Amino acid sequence: MAAKLSFSDLWSDVCAVRDRSPLVHSITNLVVINFNANVLLAAGASPVMAHAHEEVADMVGIAQALVLNIGTLDPYWIESMQLALRAAAKRGIPVVLDPVGAGATKYRNEAIEQLLMTSLPTVVRGNGSEIMSVAGSAAQTRGVDSSAAATDALGAAQSLVQRTQGVVCVSGQIDHILDASHRWAQLSNGHAWMTRITGVGCSATALIGAFCAVQPDAWRATVAAMALLGVVGEVAAEKVIARGKGVGSLQMALLDELQLLDQGTFEQRLKLEVAQW
């Protein structure tokens, strides 16, 4: 039987984030800390970014979700992430991993494997090349950019789901969200300009953490988070272009629309297909 998911279900998760303001602990990369925090705030969540070994476990102890992003790696941060993973596993809170740049360097690949060996995440989100690399498939990554389409990574995503027994989200022109129950969602929202702002993908990962904090079904939470960002990106880009502005204005417009988006616009614009894989 095919999985079922109504647009109103997803909107109720958007409202839950706004109403409950979950605390999301992000150990993320230096490039995107500010934007990720603002995205979480605009969506209604509460961000905290702490990586000191002396406090990371305590911070996880008061958070409702943990987000790990390996964009700007160093040995200290890897150990911070491992400490956070152990604390999250002990508490049973959801963990979202963003393997930024997976496949680009041996060091990066080894760090990802260290994290996976420490504790398996609830959700892994990445572009096609990153997911293929984490799953052990051959893929060439250009920094944080993907050389593989999301559809090219579906086999790798399925393999990774089998390993983590969780959710894998492959971002691209079409976003694919798969889980161990063989549910498969495809989202076709968004705008090409979103790829020209640093941190949008990383912010998607942060949003997934916020949604997992309020929705125990991690697959549904991931679909809701990606749906929200896709629709918001579409609406924001159209408004910015209509004003004759560029991608700098889009960054601010994204935050505005995250706060202001209404149910009617969300459900009217959402392009979602749900099936089994």
From Swiss-Prot:
| Cofactor(s) annotated in UniProt | Mg(2+)
Catalytic reaction list: 5-(2-hydroxyethyl)-4-methylthiazole + ATP = 4-methyl-5-(2-phosphooxyethyl)-thiazole + ADP + H(+)
GO terms of biological process kind: thiamine biosynthetic process; thiamine diphosphate biosynthetic process
The protein's annotated pathway: Cofactor biosynthesis; thiamine diphosphate biosynthesis; 4-methyl-5-(2-phosphoethyl)-thiazole from 5-(2-hydroxyethyl)-4-methylthiazole: step 1/1
InterPro entries, per database record? Hyethyz_kinase (IPR000417), Ribokinase-like (IPR029056)
Q: Name one GO molecular function term.
A: magnesium ion binding
Q: What is its EC number?
A: 2.7.1.50
Q: Which UniProt keywords apply?
A: ATP-binding, Kinase, Magnesium, Metal-binding, Nucleotide-binding, Thiamine biosynthesis, Transferase
Provide the binding site for ATP. Answer: R125, S171
**Pfam families given in the database record:** HK
Taxonomy, superkingdom? Bacteria
Residues involved in substrate binding: M49, G199
Q: Which family does it belong to?
A: Belongs to the Thz kinase family.
**HAMAP family hit by this protein:** Thz_kinase (MF_00228)
Q: What does this protein do?
A: Catalyzes the phosphorylation of the hydroxyl group of 4-methyl-5-beta-hydroxyethylthiazole (THZ).
- The protein depicted here goes by the name Hydroxyethylthiazole kinase
